[in-house]
Structure formats: C-alpha cells, structure tokens
Amino acid sequence: MMNKLYIGNLSPAVTVDDLRQLFGDRKLPLAGQVLLKSGYAFVDYPDQNWAIRAIETLSGKVELHGKIMEVDYSVSKKLRSRKIQIRNIPPHLQWEVLDGLLAQYGTVENVEQVNTDTETAVVNVTYATREEAKIAVEKLSGHQFENYSFKISYIPDEEVSSPSPPQRAQRGDHSSREQGHAPGGTSQARQIDFPLRILVPTQFVGAIIGKEGLTIKNITKQTQSRVDIHRKENSGAAEKPVTIHATPEGTSEACRMILEIMQKEADETKLAEEIPLKILAHNGLVGRLIGKEGRNLKKIEHETGTKITISSLQDLSIYNPERTITVKGTVEACASAEIEIMKKLREAFENDMLAVNTHSGYFSSLYPHHQFGPFPHHHSYPEQEIVNLFIPTQAVGAIIGKKGAHIKQLARFAGASIKIAPAEGPDVSERMVIITGPPEAQFKAQGRIFGKLKEENFFNPKEEVKLEAHIRVPSSTAGRVIGKGGKTVNELQNLTSAEVIVPRDQTPDENEEVIVRIIGHFFASQTAQRKIREIVQQVKQQEQKYPQGVASQCSK
C-alpha cells in the first residue's frame, strides 16, 4: 500500500522542482509523481518507514519560500476511522505503560510497532470505533511523556474504503506492537517480528542501561533494535526479563552486546564463572526446539560448543510463563547458540501463526501479550466468556482499590467487565470475582489479578499463587471434557499442571450448563481454560454438522 503524504502551508511560489530538490537535499528522494495544488501538494512513498522519516524530518521544521511546511499522512475525513499512528514515543517507555495509556480512551484492537530507524518508537493503533480513535487523537496529541511529546496522525483504514464483509480478518490483540509491518512491506507480506526474551541478573541491569541510558541507547542505535528492560516485574527478583525487538540479525547482535557487557561487569567484580545466556520461550514452542529424542538441541550444543538445559514445566508462573533455556559457554559460543535457538523458535512460532488462521483463536491467550505480536480475531465481536475467579477475602480491597480506582483501571486495561460478587456469609474465606470478556481480555484480567495478589503479599513470596476458577460448559459436553474412563481430563491435568474437576453428578442449571472447576497457577489455569473451551467448540461444530441425535451420540 502506498503511503500518501499531504504537504501543506506552501507558498504559491513553490514549484514541483522546489519540492523535489528539498526532499532530495534531505535524502528523501521522491520517485513518484508530485501532485501540486494551490498551497498544498501530495506525494507518495511506497514504504511506511520513508513516510515517517519525511514527516519527522520536515513537518514544522523546514521553511520553503518563507513558509514553514506541514507534512502528514493524507487521510480524507471519510477515511479518518479507527486507525492512528503515534510517533516520538520515548525509547525506554515500558509497553505496559503505553498499553494503559491507550486503553484510557477505548478498546484497543491492535497495536503494531513500526520498524523505523528513528531513536524514538512508532506504533500504529486500531481502536474498536471511530469515536474512540477521535478521542485518542484529541487527548494524546502533544501528550508529554518523559520530556517527549507524542505526535499523532490518522492513517488510512483499508476496511473503510474496501467493501469487505463484516468479518474482520487479521485483527490483532491489544499491546501487540511486536508484529508491525517490515519496512517496505505490505499488509499481505507482513513480517512477523519474533522478539527475543532473555533473563539478566538484576545486578547487571545498571551496566546494561549505562550512565544516563547511554549504553542501551548505543545498543539500540547500532542494532536498529528496541530493548525493553522490565525492571518493575517481580520486584526483588534475582533476574529481570529483557525483551529485544528487531530483525533476526539485529536481535542477535543486541544479545551479543548485552552478553559482552555482563561478562565484562562480572570480570571486573571478580565473579569467577561465565555468565550464562537465559532465553525465555513459550512452552508450546520448546518441544520443537528440542526435537525428536533431543536431536535439535544436541546438534546446537555440538556445533556451538555450549551446554544447554531447559527448565521444567513446574517452574511456570505468572511472572515467568515461559520455559527458561539456559546456555552455558563463552560469550561467542552463547551468541552462536542464540542464533540457532531463535531460528528454531521463530520457525515454530510462524507455523503456529499460520495454524491460527485455520483453528480456534485460543493461541492468543496462551502466548503472553508482552511477548508476541497480534493474534487474529476470527469474528468482528469475539465470543464473550464468563469466568468466576475466587480470591482471598482479605484481598478484595486491594483488587478494588481506593474508590474503585484499581478495578476500573483493570477493566479498561483488559477490555473486560470485572465485578466482585457479594459475600455469601460473614466469615467466608474467599470471594468470587466475575470476569466477562473475550479470551484476550480474560488472559489480561486474570493475569493482573494473580499478579496483584503476589505483589501485595497475600501469598508467601516462595509460594506459588494458585486460585480456583469456575467456567460453565454445556452439560452435553461434560462427558467429552472427562473423556472415556477420565482419559481426557487426566491428559488435560498432565498437560497444564492444573487440577480440573468435572463433577459427574452435577445438576445442570437453567441454561443446561454445568461448572468445571480449575485450580492452579495462572499459566496452568489459562491453558486448561483454553483447552476446555476448545473441546466445547469442537462439540458445537459437530452439532452443526450432524442432526441432534447423531451429535449427542458423538459427544458421549
């Protein structure tokens, strides 16, 4: 798709040659036609990265024939819909903070990071409605954040101009900036940006950032990457997660530079051992990294001269819902191993993303939102789910917050309805939180609640936060969830590490539904919820294909 730019506030004396020369002098050559009108002009750039560079370089900064020109995307009023672009985002702004800011103005359907060569970040944001996007433009234009002033533009929403059916394909999840268009790419040829997640010892974080942020700025500049150090996650932990967004080559180079900094710091502080590389990877990808009988890992170890181990499933938690791949060896060896490991993980992830197009959309709730890019919705309005989550009674105040501030903020962030049911008695030990929303909203809301309970010390620091969740399923599908001789539910428990209880003698409610109880830590509970929903969906599809009698036989 061409990126048409509007050039405004031009003097009547300006010619096409003037514009071509001005753009050329600033290394922004115009290859296509320049459409010059009285006082304004239009130019096209096939590459969004070049378009952004032109806006940032020229708009409000360059004088031509005595007038300061304005440059922005050319979007007619009828195309000013749900899509906006935010530029000049601070390079070290945590994505979680940006998520919360964007969610204040409406439901965010998709956030894509645009790969640019600017020091600051650029994202394209799609709101659920035109009105929400309009409010966001008004409120965020010029918004000051860490001495950076946001710059906002409308960008064309292809769905407004194309007579497509109501079903919206390729609509991503909130906070999904990691899967932006590659420079020069189109929406059909989208490059999936698969970020590298690593754990670094907390004592090295200062060295990686450097004085006044100079070291990390140097890393991002040299490697054309974005490096997020999640300093606030899991306060007091010995290690902090670091997320690197870039091309595969840029990611690997940034990783190598971080390894070198840590090793240098370790040498100077006389730490005897080599600092291992710890890569975080989603559990669903790890099996394919290991390979049959461990062949893939053994091959990487042999070729790079490293020793590689992978954490057990039992280590999964809300703060680290990924497996930890520990690579031991020299800096050079670890860097070489990272290239090969990420190659395998990236390949597996891309295959999964292709699979999403033909399967139910539960992937989006299994892959953590801070790690990967947008996951397609398969309907304009994703199916609403209701989950009842039980929390300690003494934690209710922390979840609600002062005058309800925290629960309102949480609901906005997640895009869910969150209500706390009245206590069933004066001395109950648990209260029920009713969460209503699509899968992505469930993931975010439940994740934040688990995290809040951990942060506020309602559980022992060494104790895993385990909560009970109730979901309702049609009574006709309960047998399928249990499986013959309990086989399915046993496999489900082994896969997810959650306890799943489907009472056989439960009386269905007025909607012919029964309650499935799920007990476990956040990641275990989420995986179990998604797998159970998938089973229910499969039964529904069977019932649509076959007469009722046949379908009911199939479900038993």
UniProtKB/Swiss-Prot annotation:
GO terms for molecular function: mRNA 3'-UTR binding; mRNA 5'-UTR binding; N6-methyladenosine-containing RNA reader activity. The keyword Cytoplasm applies. The modification Phosphothreonine is found at residue 507. One of its GO terms (biological process) is regulation of translation. Keywords: Cytoplasm, mRNA transport, Nucleus, Phosphoprotein, Repeat, RNA-binding, Translation regulation, Transport. CDD domains: KH-I_IGF2BP2_rpt1, KH-I_IGF2BP2_rpt3, KH-I_IGF2BP2_rpt4, RRM1_IGF2BP2, RRM2_IGF2BP2. Residues 3-76, 82-157 form the RRM domain. The keyword 4Fe-4S does not apply. Residues 193-258, 274-341, 384-449, 466-532 form the KH domain. One of its GO terms (cellular component) is cytoskeleton. It comes from the Eukaryota. Can form homooligomers and heterooligomers with IGF2BP1 and IGF2BP3 in an RNA-dependent manner. Interacts with HNRPD. Interacts with IGF2BP1. Interacts with ELAVL1, DHX9, HNRNPU, MATR3 and PABPC1. Belongs to the RRM IMP/VICKZ family. RNA-binding factor that recruits target transcripts to cytoplasmic protein-RNA complexes (mRNPs). This transcript 'caging' into mRNPs allows mRNA transport and transient storage. It also modulates the rate and location at which target transcripts encounter the translational apparatus and shields them from endonuclease attacks or microRNA-mediated degradation. Preferentially binds to N6-methyladenosine (m6A)-containing mRNAs and increases their stability. Binds to the 5'-UTR of the insulin-like growth factor 2 (IGF2) mRNAs. Binding is isoform-specific. This is Insulin-like growth factor 2 mRNA-binding protein 2. It comes from Pongo abelii (Sumatran orangutan). The gene is IGF2BP2.
